[in-house]
Structures are given as C-alpha cells and as structure tokens.
From Swiss-Prot:
Sequence intervals crossing the membrane: none
Signal peptide: 1-21
Principal location listed in the UniProt entry: other
Swiss-Prot/TrEMBL keywords: Glycoprotein, Repeat, Signal
Family: Belongs to the mam3/map4 family.
Name of the protein: Putative cell agglutination protein SPAPB2C8.01
Cellular component, GO, one term: cell surface
Function noted in UniProt: May be involved in agglutination during conjugation or other aspects of colony formation.
C-alpha cells in the first residue's frame, strides 16, 4: 500500500494576558491598597481555536484529512473523508498575533525508531520498514509484567524482530510463546545475575514453523551462534511429522541452561540444530531436575547437535539416556565447581544406533574432541554378539579416570566411539559408582575408543585385564588424589589380540628424555630390517621430561610412534622396577596402544608385559612435584620430519594437569599428508609454558598445530624473556598464552607476533587477577596473513573473564573468502578496550568483524586518548562502545568514526548511570556504506538500559532494495519563517505538492499546566516551642529552616494534603483564617483543618508571557514566607540561599508583604519557583501574583508543573544539603 502524506503546520499560538494594574503598597500604615476583585481571564480552549494540527493523507483511491486540537494534555481529533475526482476545497482559518510560523523539515523516509528498555513496566516495540511491498506482519507479544526483553542482531534479511508472534498458517513465520510471568529473557549479559533469552529466526522460504516452547518459570536459557547458514535457531520445537524438524523438550522447573557465562555461578545450555536434508528427527530428552548440560563445538559440518534423542527405528538416530537425578554434565567451565557433560552426535550415513547407557548416580562424564569427521559420540554401548564390538569392562569400585577438569575435586568419564564403517556396535558397560574414566584423542580417524574389552573368540578384539589391587593408572585428572586408568586400543585390521597383563604391585615404570635426534621414543623396540625403526637416544644429563604419571614422584617420558606402512613388530621391553610408562597419540592410524609387547612369532601383535608390583603409569596428571614432557607423533604418509627441539637447561614443560606446582609443555603434532615440518621453537631460558590445568600457580604454554593439506610451516615465535602465556585455566594467579592455528587450504603463514616486554596476554579464565590475551586465527581459503599488532608497552588486552579487576582485549577475526588483511590497529597508549565482563570497574573495547564476500578491510579506528568505549557489561560504572557490523553482499567499508572527545556512547547497560550509544546497521542488498555519524560534542545517545536515569538513542536501519547509504541524520535546526501569515489556507486534491514537505511533531511540547502544593505539620523540634505557641505572639525569628519542608531530610512520610491548582482553579489565595485554605482536590477537609503549626510548600514553573523584567508580589503573609527562584528551586535550595523573605510584624500586628525581582525574562521561557509559608499560632494567610513593567498576572495563569525538559522531584525527595 503506497501511502503519501502531506503534513502542514497551521497552528498559531497566542498568549493570554491579564490586563489589570499593578498593586502598590501604602507604606504609611503598612496596608496594601485593595482593588476590586480581579476577574480571572482563562485562555479559550474551544475546538475552533488554535493550536491545532491538520494532516492530509492519500491512501490509494481515498483521501483523509484529520484535524487535531490539543486540549490541555489530551487531543481531540476530527476526520474528514475526501473523494477522488473533482472534490471541494478544504479551507482552514487560523489567526496569529505574533506573525511567526515554525516549519520543521521532515526527517528522511525509512527512519526506524524504537525504544528498548527494561524495568517494572510493560514495553513493546514494532520495527517498521519503508519497503512497502512486504505484506507480512511483525507482532510483539505483550510480555508479562516485570518481563525484560531485548535483542541485537544483524544479517542480510531485510526485516528482523525479537520476541515476535505470527500465525501458524503463514509460511516461514516466527512465533515466540509468551514466557511465564516473572521470566527474564535476554541475549548478552555478565555478572552474578541470571540472564536469559530465547531467540528464533525463520527463513522466508522455509515452509515449516519454528516455535519456542514455554520455558518453565525460573528457567534460564540462551545461545550465541554464527556461521554462513542463513537460518539458525535455538531451543526450537516442531512437530514430529516434519522432516528435519528440531524439537526441544521443556526442561524441568529449576533447570539452568546457557552457553556463555562468567563468574562463580553455574550457567548452562542445550543446543540442537537439525539438517535440512536429514529425514530423521532430533529430540532432546527431558533432563532431570537440577542437571546442568552444555556444549561448544565447531567444524565444517553444516548441522550439529548436543544431547539429542531419537527412536531406535530411525537409521542414524542418536539417543541420550536421561542421566540419574543430581548428575552434573558440562563442557566448558572455570573455578572450583564441578561441571560435566555428555555429548553424542550421529552420522547421517551410519545404519547402526548410538546409545548412551545410564551413568551411575554421582558419576561425572565428559569429552573433548576435534577433527574432520562429521559425527562423533561418547559413552556408547552395543551388544556382545556383533563382530568387532568394543566393550569397557566395569572397573573396580574406587578406580578414578577422567579427561578435562579443574580444581581440587574428582571428575570422571568413560569415552567410547564407534567407526562409521564398522557394522558392529560400541557398548560402554555401566561404570561403578565413583569410578572415573576418560581419554583425549585427535586426528582424522573417525572413531577411537578407550578402556575396551571383548571376548577372546572375536578377531581384532581388545581386552583390558583387571589390574592388581594397588596398581595406579590414569589419563586426565587434577588435585592431590591418585587417579588411575589402563588404556588399550585395537586396530581394525589386526587379527591378533591386545592384552594388558596384570602389573605387579609396586612396580613403577617410566622413560623421559630429550635430545637433538629427530625421533625419540620410550619402551619401543623394532628390528633393524624394518624401515622406519624407532630409536631411543640417550638424553643429556639433567634434562627432565615426562608425560603420564601421578603421585609425589617425578615421572617423565617422551613418546613417538610411526604408523602406516610399517610391517614389522613393535615390542615393549620389560622396564626395570620404578619405571613409569604411558602414551598420548594422534594421526591417521585407526588404533594405537601403549604398554605393548609383541612376540616374535605373531606378526604385528602387541603384548603388555606385567609390570612389577607398585608400578605407576599414567598420561595426564597432577601433584606437588615438577613433571615435564615433550610429545611429538608422526602419522600416515608424512615424508617430512617431526622434531622436538631440545629445551634449554632448567626449562620446565608439561601437558595436562593441575595442582600447586608449575607444570608446562610444548606440544606439536603433524597430521595427514603434510610434507612440511612442524617445529617447536626453543623457548628462552626461564620461560614458562603450559596448556590445560588449574590451581593456584602460574601455568603457561605455546601450542601450534598444522592440519589438512597445508604445505607451509606452523611456527611459534619465541616469546621475549619474562613473557607469560597460557590458554585454559582457573584460579587466583595470572595465566596467559598466545595461540595461533592454521587450518584448511591456507598456504600462508600464521604468526604470533612477539609481544613487547612486560605485556600480559591470555584467553579464558576467572578469578581476581588480571588476565589478558591477543588471539588471531586464519580460516578456510584465505591466502593472506593474520597478524596481531604489537600492543604498546603497558597496554592491557583480554577476551572473556569476570571479577573486580580491569580486563581488556582487541580481537580480530578473518572469515569466509576475504582476500584482504584483518588488522587490529594499535590503540593509543593508555587506551582501555575489552569485550565481555562484569564488576565495578571501567571496561571498554572496540570490535570489528569482516564477513562473507567482503573484499575490503575492517579497521578499528584509533580512539582519542581518554575515550571510553565498550559493548556488553553491567554494574554501576559508565561503559560505552562504538560497534559497526558489515553484512550480506556489502562491498564497501565498515568504519567506526572516531567520536569527538568527551562523547559517551554505549549499547547494553543497567544500573543508575548514564549509558549511551549510536548504532547503525546495513542489511539486504545495500551496496553503499554504513556510517555512524559523529555526534556533536556532549550529545548523549543510548539503546537498552534500565534504572532511574534518563536514556536516549538514535537507531537507523536500512532495508529492502535501497542501494544508497544508511545514515543517522543529525537533526537540522528549527527554521523560523517570519512575515505576513494568511488567515485562510486552501487545499485541494489536485494541488501541486510543495517542494518542501512540512512535518508537524505528533506531540508539540508546551509544558503541563498547574501549580503543585503540599501541607505539612511544623515538626522542627529546635524551634517548635517558640514558633508554635498556644498563647501569646509567634516568634517569627525562630523559623530559620525553611528548606527542611519538602526535602529528603523531612521526617514526615507524606504531606497532610497535596494537590495541583490548575489554570481554571481558584487562585491560591489564603485569606486570614484559623483554618487552612480550601484547595482542591480535598477542599472540604482542608478548610476544616486548623492552620496553627502548619507549613504550605508551593512549586511550579512560571512561563514568561512577554520578554520583560518581572517581580513576585506577596501579600497577607502570616506568619513567615520564603522563596527561591531558578534551578535551585528544583534542587539545591537551602536555608540561606533564598531570594524572597517576608513575615508578620509583631510590633504593629500587620501581615507581611513585598515585591521581589525575578530579573529580565525571555518570552516563552520557564522559571522554576519554590515558595513556603508557615503559620505558628492563631490565624494564617498568604497571597501572591506576578507583574511586569506593564501588567499584572494571576499566579496560576502562567504556572506549569513541568516543562518539555524539566520537572520537580516529588515532595520529600532530593536536596539533602538544606543547611548549606
């Protein structure tokens, strides 16, 4: 529907004056000269008078004229319908006595305005578009009282919305079910409060429906995701009959789910996404009450899911059995709490079924894995009758095995994965209560397993013999306890059997060393006739290296295994008592093992000789001693060389662990068909590096991995001496790292620039210390270079964290097919930037991201020194940011204009401070530039907020097929046209449109008419006995604290009487009486209340009729009067800064009077005025008016309770310094 509108201002305002002479005073007998009672002149407000506004609308074949007459604070609207063709003219007659007409230039079409906020009221918004060709409707369901809703989003879809509801019959509609009363939903947050949101977006071409099921009261849900798939959703529910639908079962009441979080609270989420081409169904089974589940994953597979359940009859389905009540599962976490998760994903091409067996109560399970296989799973179980099955024998009660964890608690898991090409089933036997099992692996092999056992009659089976009591074996663990595991893996093509023989009690085995030989290994022996043999070089004296162990002894090893085309035999020679052995491996070989011994007569068989009693073997560990290792593994058909550089003497390196000691390592792995070299640069003496751990000590590492078909070199630059780097950890110490990873077909080089001496960098952590990092990643087919610019010495940068300390970072990410360079400009010295955080400190950041096919450059402009910018935060401090996002097919440049010095901008906030921002977003097929105009100095803008302060914003969004530029326009100044104004204006349907379109504001602000008053008891204890006398004369000099009444220092909870005297009400005259005046709204009660020991406070704005000098005239003052003019009448009035004072004269018995100058005032301006009159005993009285050089004006004729920009606080609030 094409709508054109012509809005014409014909409102001409005229002031009403009161023409009666000034009152003069006869000072000879102290009496005012009384005139006849003045007749009150009231402004004519009939509908035939101005001001009024006329709007002419043309819609299709109909024409409409609306005439609006504002009457006080309401409007009366009349509509006239015009017809097509030859129509009568429409004539409006108006008058003016100023000869001035105000014309406001129309704001540009397509402007979208909205207000997002939170608090205790119901707020909703609809985002409209100027693209009039879209028939769809966007509706915002009214949230329950107290509900807080908001969203930030961008993309290529021309219309976006949040919490929108539509009908089920519209293809591609989005429906958000109204959340329960009191439910809080949101997107980005931080701190110790629970924040939640449910986001759903539907594709215009999808015929299905995306529905968000009602979340139980108190449930917290959220998600953050990105990618190149045009439509994503979270917590979505659809019918079971729709192919590829996604259903999220309503979690039990009290369940907490989330994705991104920080601090010491538990946050969790359950994410499920279905593939459009999968005919099966993905279902999330109800999680037991109190269960916490979450996952984070990445890769190139378009569809992933977590905690998904389907029926057994559907090929390739995935089922997660409901864990026992109280079980805790999770993936990413920090601090000293237990977090656990169980992850399972099914492959579309697998005909079998993956099942997760119920875990015993109290058992903690988890896994982390990566690779290019689209589907992985953990904790899988199958039947014993299928050839090639994998079985995990139930370990003895008390056995501890685990994978990823932190703190001083025990965490446990058992992991098993089946291969897509194996027709058998993978089964995980119930683990005994308290048992901990786990594994970590990586590579391109689709399926790996740990702790597997099968029968002796099945070819290729793997059996783990129950170790003797007291034997210690383990994989991943932390704390001061002993954790144990025995690992064995069978190869699919091996016809023999892998057996782990009971280890003798008390035997300890290990081998740790390092050197300059390209290949090192421990407990490995091969024949001289086999190509690719493994040799153990004698390490240099004093070198310490290790991999797997536990306890208070030092155990060390370096393991390397060659795989692929070796036809020989790997033999593990008996180690002497006290030796510790273990293995971590990766590559393209389907099955690997450690602690293996082969016989000379069996080709390729592996046997583990029973170690002596008391032997300790492990993989990942912790304790109170220093443990170190360097691990490198060559795999597949790699023709290059894997080299472990000899660390300098005294260097400490290690892999995974936690505790109270320093553990560090440097790990490099080559995989696939890479013909290049993976090299770990020798860190400088004294440098500390580490990977995964937790505790109270400093842990650091530098990690580099080459993958895929990359022919280049992955190099970790030697950090400067004294630099501290690290990756994942928690605790109260400083942990930092610099991480770079090359992926896909990138032929370039990924380099981590050596940060300046003293710079601190880090990635993920929590606690009360400063943590910072700089992270750069190159992805997919980008042939360029990703570089992290050296921050200036002393600069602080960081990414995710929480606490009360300042954390900051600068992050840049290149994605898609961008051929340019992503650069983070070096911020000026002293600039503070950051992304996500919470607390009471100032945090700031500037973030820019390039997306999809944009060939340009994303640049973060240097903010001026001292400027403060930020994105997401909460607290009581001011936080601000400037954010720009390029989307879709925009070929231009996204630039964040440098705001002027002193400008404050912000996005999401809460609290009692001012928060402001300016946001601009480009969408659809816009080929122009998206620009955020530099706001003028001291301009304040804002978007989302809550609290007791004023917040404002300007938001512009471009939509549809507009090829131009989306710009936030600075409002033009009001244009005043003077001259002769016609009293009659004629319009017709055939009139030629004017060249300038005139817009009338929908609500012209001229203030709110009225005068406020409040009556109080006189309760100032210091002067009450002298002022409030029951007999004799009032001591007027005793009343010296006039600012007390109406202020926050007042002890009375509320006035005795309060109200507003309107322009048509009686003048506030108080003739001499023993009773209070009869003011509305309760005149009867007031005039029957005695006025002794009472005080009346008046507050109002005086609107100036004409430019002139003015005075306040008071009469009949009985007993004491004070007055304040200007801004101090609103806030800051005191007992000593009053502008007017009069009192009853005890010697003559005459009432007080006087005239007090208010200065020269401009026509139309507003002057704040506060007056107080108090009566001690006997009669009371008071009257006042205003006068200029020519006229006198009644008190209420020009009194206003509020202006367009100012208002008084309620009586009893504000102004604490009354004694100043």
């Amino acid at each position: 529907m094409a709508v054109s509108r012509l809005l014409i201002l014909i409102c001409l305002y005229s002031f009403v004056t009161f023409a009666y002479p000034k009152v003069t005073q006869d000072y000879r007998n102290h009496l005012p000269i009384k005139f006849a009672k003045r007749s009150e002149v009231t402004p004519n407000t009939s509908l035939a008078q101005c001001p009024k506004y006329v709007t002419v609308y043309s819609s299709g074949s109909s024409h409409y004229i609306s005439t609006i007459y504002p009457v006080n604070k309401t409007h009366h609207t009349e509509y006239t319908t015009l017809t097509d063709g030859s129509i009568d003219t429409y004539t409006i007659t108006a008058k003016t006595d100023t000869g001035t007409d105000v014309v406001v230039v129309e704001t540009s079409a397509n402007t979208i305005t909205t207000t997002l906020y939170s608090g205790s009221l119901e707020f909703t918004t609809t985002l409209d578009s100027a693209n009039g060709t879209t028939p769809a409707t966007i509706e915002v369901v009214e949230p329950a009282a107290g509900t807080v809703t908001t969203t930030i989003y961008s993309g290529t879809t021309p219309f976006n919305t949040t919490l929108a509801s539509a009908t089920d019959t519209v293809p591609g509609t989005v429906e958000v079910v109204e959340p329960e009363a009191g439910t809080v939903t949101t997107t980005v947050y931080s701190g110790t409060q629970e924040y939640t949101t449910t986001l759903a977006t539907a594709s215009g071409t999808v015929s299905g429906t995306v529905e968000v099921v009602d979340t139980a009261a108190g449930t917290v849900t959220t998600t953050i995701y990105s990618g190149t798939t045009p439509f994503n959703t979270t917590l979505a529910s659809a019918t079971d009959t729709v192919p590829g639908t996604v259903e999220v079962v309503e979690p039990e009441a009290g369940t907490v789910t989330t994705t991104v979080y920080s601090g010491t609270q538990e946050y969790t989420t359950t994410l499920a996404t279905a593939s459009g081409t999968v005919s099966g169904t993905v279902e999330v089974v109800d999680t037991a009450a109190g269960t916490v589940t979450t996952t984070i994953y990445s890769g190139t597979t378009p569809f992933n899911t977590t905690l998904a359940s389907a029926t057994d009859t559907v090929p390739g389905t995935v089922e997660v059995v409901e864990p026992e009540a109280g079980t805790v599962t999770t993936t990413v976490y920090s601090g000293t709490q237990e977090y656990t998760t169980t992850l399972a994903t099914a492959s579309g091409t697998v005909s079998g079924t993956v099942e997760v067996v119920d875990t015993a109560a109290g058992t903690v399970t988890t896994t982390i894995y990566s690779g290019t296989t689209p589907f992985n799973t953990t904790l899988a179980s199958a039947t014993d009758t299928v050839p090639g099955t994998v079985e995990v024998v139930e370990p003895e009660a008390g056995t501890v095995t685990t994978t990823v964890y932190s703190g001083t608690q025990e965490y446990t898991t058992t992991l098993a994965t089946a291969s897509g090409t194996v027709s058998g089933t993978v089964e995980v036997v119930d683990t005994a209560a308290g048992t901990v099992t786990t594994t970590i692996y990586s590579g391109t092999t689709p399926f790996n397993t740990t702790l597997a056992s099968a029968t002796d009659t099945v070819p290729g089976t793997v059996e783990v013999v129950e170790p003797e009591a007291g034997t210690v074996t383990t994989t991943v663990y932390s704390g001061t306890q002993e954790y144990t595991t025995t690992l064995a893996t069978a190869s699919g093509t091996v016809s023999g059997t892998v057996e782990v023989v009971d280890t003798a009690a008390g035997t300890v085995t290990t081998t740790i060393y390092s050197g300059t030989t390209p290949f090192n290994t421990t407990l490995a022996s091969a024949t001289d006739t086999v190509p690719g043999t493994v040799e153990v070089v004698e390490p240099e004296a004093g070198t310490v290296t290790t991999t797997v162990y536990s306890g208070t002894q030092e155990y060390t090893t370096t393991l390397a295994t060659a795989s692929g085309t070796v036809s020989g035999t790997v033999e593990v020679v008996d180690t002497a008592a006290g030796t510790v052995t273990t293995t971590i491996y990766s590559g393209t070989t389907p099955f690997n093992t450690t602690l293996a011994s082969a016989t000379d007569t069996v080709p390729g068989t592996v046997e583990v000789v029973e170690p002596e009693a008391g032997t300790v073997t492990t993989t990942v560990y912790s304790g109170t001693q220093e443990y170190t290792t360097t691990l490198a593994t060559a795999s597949g058909t790699v023709s290059g060389t894997v080299e472990v550089i000899e660390p300098a003497a005294g260097t400490v390196t290690t892999t995974v662990y936690s505790g109270t000691q320093e553990y560090t390592t440097t790990l490099a792995t080559a995989s696939g068909t890479v013909s290049g070299t993976v090299e770990v640069i020798e860190p400088a003496a004294g440098t500390v590096t580490s990977t995964v751990y937790s505790g109270t000590q400093e842990y650091t590492t530098t990690l580099a991995t080459a993958s895929g078909t990359v022919s280049g070199t992955v190099e970790v630059i030697e950090p400067a001496a004294g630099t501290v780097t690290t990756t994942v950890y928690s605790g109260t110490q400083e942990y930092t790292t610099t991480l770079a990873t090359a992926s896909g077909t990138v032929s370039g080089t990924v380099e981590v620039i050596e940060p300046a001496a003293g710079t601190v960098t880090t990635t993920v952590y929590s606690g009360s210390e400063v943590y910072t990092t700089t992270l750069a990643s190159a992805s997919e087919s980008v042939p360029g270079t990703v570089e992290v610019v050296d921050p200036e010495a002393g600069s602080v940068t960081t990414t995710i964290y929480s606490g009360s300390v300042e954390y900051t970072t600068v992050l840049a990410d290149a994605s898609g097919s961008v051929t340019g360079t992503v650069e983070v400009v070096e911020p000026a010295a002293g600039t503070v930037t950051t992304t996500v955080y919470s607390g009471s400190e100032v945090y700031t950041t500037t973030l820019a991201s390039a997306s999809e096919s944009v060939p340009g450059t994303v640049e973060v402009v240097d903010p001026e020194a001292g400027s403060v910018t930020t994105t997401i935060y909460s607290g009581s401090v001011e936080y601000t940011t400037v954010l720009a996002d390029a989307s879709g097919s925009v070929t231009g440049t996204v630039e964040v204009v440098e705001p002027a010095a002193g400008t404050v901008t912000g996005t999401l906030t809460s609290g009692s401070q001012f928060f402001t921002t300016t946001i601009a977003q480009a969408s659809g097929s816009v080929s122009g530039n998206v620009e955020v105009i530099e706001p003028s100095g001291s301009t304040v803008t804002s978007t989302i907020y809550s609290g007791s302060e004023s917040f404002t914003t300007t938001l512009a969004v471009g939509s549809g097929t507009i090829p131009g530029t989306v710009e936030v326009i600075l409002p033009a100044p009001t244009t005043i046209y003077t001259g002769t104004v016609a009293t009659t204006i004629t319009y017709s349907s055939s009139s030629t449109p004017v060249s300038t379109v005139v817009v009338i504001p929908t609500a012209v602000c001229s203030g709110v008419r009225g005068l406020q008053y409040a009556v109080y008891n006189y309760d100032i204890s210091a002067s009450k006995s002298k002022f409030c006398v029951s007999s004799g004369n009032t001591d007027v000099a005793a009343f010296t604290q006039p600012a007390y009444f109406g202020s926050s220092s007042l002890d009375q909870s509320s006035p005795l009487f309060t109200g507003v005297l309107s322009s048509t009400a009686a003048l506030p005259e108080w003739t001499s009486s023993y009773y209070l005046p009869d003011y509305p709204p309760d005149a009867t009660a007031m005039e029957s209340t005695r006025c002794n020991c009472k005080a009346i406070v008046y507050q109002f704005f005086f609107r100036v009729p004409y430019t002139d000098t003015y005075e306040l005239n008071v009469y009949n003052v009985d007993d004491v009067f004070y007055g304040w003019f200007g801004d101090k009448a609103i806030s800051g009035w005191s007992n000593t800064n009053y502008d007017a004072y009069a009192y009853w004269h005890v010697t003559t018995g005459q009432t007080g009077m006087g005239s007090f100058s208010m200065g020269t005032l401009t026509q139309g301006s507003f002057l704040p005025i506060r007056l107080i009159v108090a009566n001690g005993g006997g009669k009371g009285g008071f009257n006042f008016d205003f006068s200029s050089s020519t006229d006198t004006y009644a008190a209420t004729s020009y009194a206003y309770t509020a202006t367009c920009t100012q208002s008084f606080l309620p009586f009893g609030l504000g102004n604490g310094g009354i004694d100043n």
